A protein has these predicted regions:
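SAM-dependent transferase fold signal centered on methyltransferase-like domains
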Residues: 1-302
Length: 302
């Protein structure tokens, strides 16, 4: 995400300095902005050997004067001062929509860290000049949404990526979203494949399935099928045991997964008295709004 050759970063939302430290580990010199006096002292102490500059002020009030930067980094606060949760349609404080143009006069690149609950289509609508959007997960749980916006727009389309890391920060996969023509299977085949949340968030499910040789069960449904066993990184893989037009009466336990289905998981679990099971799964599907429903009983294999 950090542009190649970037040496000086302005971190407008330094907080305790975790992200600041990350930039410094990449060899960057960082200017930090933080209004809390206690955190300012912490930032100064922890940065005493790194050449770090700390500015005690709010991000909205900071002015760089004659300083120049390669990247401006902003992680907007997702809580109001009252402690109330900001709606996900609100990008937080400082609001990038209000200040982006100013930040781009300070550096050729702005890097935003947003709530991972923000939809990629909203990101592309709000920041049409973004050249890179990354949904970052750790052990399959989406943790962050990173958006990179250059001062000079690229002629290329915005690149969307799903990236997963292990607990030590090592990448386990990096999967791009791309426009692909995915074949539709005539029926559910011997195996099904469920993409990770980061892939779904980035819109990379179809490109992952295409690269893995899977087929679509239904257009727009983030579940795929194949005739072969797979351990492709980026999702969970299952062997199909049976397919039904209704939930089997003898199914006593299963983890329930819904795909474009009108009823919620807990409602189905209560209605049919199905206990939790970590190995056997019930996939409840509906093929489009008002379409046919089907139920797949499957065993997880990877």
């Amino acid at each position: 995400m950090i542009p190649e050759g970037a040496q000086r970063v302005l971190d407008l939302t330094a907080g305790s300095g975790i992200d600041t430290w990350g930039f410094e580990q990449h060899g960057c010199r960082v200017d930090c902005v933080e209004p809390d006096p206690y955190l300012v002292e912490l930032l100064k102490w922890n940065g005493r050997t790194t050449g770090r500059s700390v500015h005690e002020t709010k991000a909205e009030d900071f002015r760089p004067h004659s300083a120049t930067f390669d990247t401006v980094y902003v992680d907007p606060s997702r809580r109001e001062t009252s402690g109330a949760r900001i709606d996900f349609s609100d990008l937080g404080e400082p609001n990038p929509l209000e200040h982006l143009e100013t930040w781009l006069t300070w550096a050729p690149t702005v890097l935003l860290k947003l709530s991972p609950m923000v939809d990629r289509r909203a990101v592309q609508r709000w920041f049409p000049n973004a050249d890179l959007v990354v949904y970052l997960s750790r052990k399959r749980e989406v943790k962050e949404l990173l958006v990179r916006i250059p001062r000079v727009p690229s002629a290329a389309a915005t690149q969307l990526l799903a990236v997963d890391t292990d607990p030590f920060g090592t990448e386990t996969y990096r999967i791009p979203a791309s426009e692909v023509r995915l074949p539709s299977a005539p029926e559910v085949l011997g195996f099904i494949h469920d993409p990770d949340p980061a892939l779904r968030a980035a819109g990379a499910g179809d490109s992952w399935a295409h690269a893995s040789g899977f087929e679509a069960i239904h257009p727009g449904m983030s579940l795929y099928t194949s005739r072969f066993h797979s351990t492709a990184p980026g999702g969970r893989h299952f062997a199909v045991e049976s397919v039904h037009s209704h939930i089997p009466k003898d199914l006593k336990s299963a983890s329930i997964v819904t795909k474009t289905f009108p009823e919620k998981v807990e409602a189905l679990r209560t209605k049919y008295g199905i206990r939790e099971d970590s190995e056997r799964f019930l996939f409840a599907l509906q093929r489009g709004t008002g379409g046919a429903k089907s139920y797949i009983v499957a065993r997880r294999i990877h």
